[in-house]
Every structure is written in C-alpha cells, then in structure tokens.
Amino acid sequence: MDKFVITGGVPLKGTIPTNGSKNSALPALAAALLTAEPVTLHRVPRVRDIRTMERLLVDIGTTVDVEGETVRLRTERIVSPEAPYELVKTMRASSLVLGPLVARSGRARVSLPGGCAIGARPINLHIFGLEQLGAKINQTHGYIEAVAPDGLRGAVVHFDRITVTGTEDLMMAAVLAKGETLLRNAAREPEVVDLAELLIKMGAKIEGAGTSTIRIQGVESLGGAVHAIIADRIEAGTFLVAGAITGGDLTVTDCIPEHVGALVSKLQQAGVDVTQPSETTVRVRGTGRLRSVDMTTEEYPGFATDLQAQYMALMTQAEGIAVVIENIFENRFMHAQELARMGANIRIDGRQAIVAGPRELTGAGVIASDLRASASLVLGALVARGETVIDRVYHIDRGYEKIEAKLAGVGAKIRRVE
C-alpha cells in the first residue's frame, strides 16, 4: 500500500489548479444510463471513485471511452441492471445507478454502498422515494432489488432529511416517469444543479434545481449531450486551507469562489487574508497568528461536511478554543485521534470537537481512515516539525487527483512511496 512521506514547515507559495468535481462527475456518469445516445463529459477527474463507476457502467452495458479528462459514454441497451458488491464495495456513490436503471429498464439490483466508514448514510431515503414513484423494492442479502415493469409515475416526494445523492437519484428516476414529480426538502448543492443542467441538455424538463423544491415533468426519452463538470469545491477548499495553515501565499485557480463562500468567511474570521483576483481564482495569504473560530457543518450553502476535517487541522494552529460541530454525518471525527498523535489538543464530545491551540505539531506515523480525514492529515503534516508518514493513502486517491504532485508544485516536501 502506498504512503505519503511529508516534511513540514514550508509555506506554500504559487498557483495550484482545481480539477472537475468528483461529486458532480459521479452522478453525471450515472445519467448516461438514461439514454441510448452518446453523452460526452469534459473535466472528469481521474480519481479512484470515477474509475470504479466507469467499470460499473461497462458491466451494465455502457461503452466508455476515456481520453484525458474527457469521457464518452453510450448505453445502447442495459445488458445487466446490476451493481455487484465486488465492484461497489469501496464506493458509496453506487446507489446513484439505482434510479437510472429502474427508470430506463424497469429493474435494478444494486449492492448496498461502501465508501467511507463515517456513520450512517441512509439509502432508505432513495428507497422511499422510488417507492413513491411506483417501484417495488426488496432488500435481501445486502442488495436492493427494485422493479417497475410498467414504468415509474410522477409523485410528490418529501425527504425527511436533506440528502444529496438521494436528490440526484430521484431526479434521474423522475425524468423518465409518467407525469410530474415534486421533490421537497431537496438538496441545494452545486452538484445537484450541475446534474440538472446536464439532464436538461439531454431533454429533461426540470425546474428549481438549487432550491429546496425541484419540479420534474417526465418525458418519453432523453437524447445525448456534451457537458463540462463544475470545479471541485472540496479540492479548492482543501488547497485554501493548505495555504492558510502553512502561512503561505497560495492562489487556487479554475474554481468557483461562490461555492467555497462558507469556508472563505471562516478563514477571514480566523485572520487569513483572502482575496478573489478573478472570477475563477481565490488567493490566501497567511498574516501571522490565527484566531480560533467555531464552526458548524450544514447543508449547502452552509459549511461543507467534506471540509470539516481540514478545518479542524487548521484550528490546531489557532489561538484559543474552537468548537467544531458535525451536523451531517455521525462518527466523522476519526481524524482527531491521528492529529492528536501529532500533538493536537482535541477533545471529542458527541457531535462536537473542542480544539485548543495553538499546538506545535510534530511528525509521526498516522493512518488515514477515510477520504477527507486523510486530507486533514496531509494538512497537519505540512505544518508539523519533522517527518510524517501517512499510511493507507488509497483513501485520498478516491477523491484527489495527484494531490502530492500539486502540493509539491507549490513547495511542499511530499512524496509517495510504496
């Protein structure tokens, strides 16, 4: 298994680019199942979860052609409407094929999703929504089996809690359903809007994406489309924290500043100089001692749960006490123990973490437990005295493309070893 070896203490300086969004590309790839026509996606990051989804689509019957960051897909027919455990055990986004498969072929058999072990990610919201649209669903032997031999029909679906993948899955199912579907308490994330824009290009009738109520008028069939994936706001945010925690001068390019607005606000409150040189760039400059600032994760446009671990690493270097509250997922503080091995003072109390700083971090051997936790360990290592070895970096490869090369390009002393 690969490891990262990082020697800290170097302020990051220069320009670092942002890739397309993994969390936007995954549902866009799944959307190709909804049509027999070609779908071309640009700016698709070459990360592990994407490659897993592409292999799954090939198994289902999609022709997948990859050329750099462009992926061309065509699903002339559904050969096997199944997502087997062997393929999807490492990826929670496997549930995104459930809606498209039932909508297009009338049946689906999807293994319960894997991915990060960060508590309950309730697929029951997907199941409830599909049942409202008329699907018959059984859960057996770790699989969800759904059938709708007469097709899906429009309905009002009210989500008990906001769910991004659930909103995306139901939106894809509803575009081919008979009649009108209303999704209430829908997720407002930029990735949901990006998927809606792709589906509209394919011929879907969708209104309200980006609000809490999405209206979908079903159509007989969808056509092909060409679409560019939006910038990855989580990768951009990770790099902004990297610049701030090292006291550097880092410009993050090819991003959408509005999508990292909640993080930028917290960075500014903490004493970081943040500017926006252009519509697609954000610059961070360290100004000396950081101030502790409390933070609570929320659905968009609030502070993203996927940036909570990175923010916690930053707060280990801030003056005072910061309370970090995790409202989205349970059991998402596994990085705290590893940061503590490096010298951080963090106390966990249920859904909140109390971070006292500043503490000098020192290099240590640490283990990545999930995708975003691994990013926080990289950030801690960048500011730590001495050498840090991070094991199980396959977690970070699920969502970041060549992060070590990007960070090395702005001065970080980081290398990958087998």
Swiss-Prot record:
Q: Which residues carry this modification: 2-(S-cysteinyl)pyruvic acid O-phosphothioketal?
A: C116
Q: Which reaction does it catalyse?
A: phosphoenolpyruvate + UDP-N-acetyl-alpha-D-glucosamine = UDP-N-acetyl-3-O-(1-carboxyvinyl)-alpha-D-glucosamine + phosphate
* InterPro entries cross-referenced by the UniProt entry: Enolpyruvate_Tfrase_dom, Enolpyruvate_Tfrase_sf, MurA_subfamily, RNA3'P_cycl/enolpyr_Trfase_a/b, UDP_GlcNAc_COvinyl_MurA
Please list the residues that bind UDP-N-acetyl-alpha-D-glucosamine.
R92, D306, I328
Where does the signal peptide begin and end? none
Q: Which GO terms describe its biological process?
A: cell division; cell wall organization; peptidoglycan biosynthetic process; regulation of cell shape; UDP-N-acetylgalactosamine biosynthetic process
UniProt subcellular location: Cytoplasm
Per the annotation, which location comes first and is thus the protein's main one?
cytoplasm
Q: Which molecular-function annotations from GO does this UniProt entry contain? A: UDP-N-acetylglucosamine 1-carboxyvinyltransferase activity
Concerning its family, UniProt says: Belongs to the EPSP synthase family. MurA subfamily.
Q: Give the PANTHER family listed for this entry.
A: UDP-N-ACETYLGLUCOSAMINE 1-CARBOXYVINYLTRANSFERASE
- Its recorded name reads UDP-N-acetylglucosamine 1-carboxyvinyltransferase
| Originating organism | Solibacter usitatus (strain Ellin6076)
For this protein's source organism, the top of the classification is:
Bacteria, Pseudomonadati, Acidobacteriota, Terriglobia, Bryobacterales
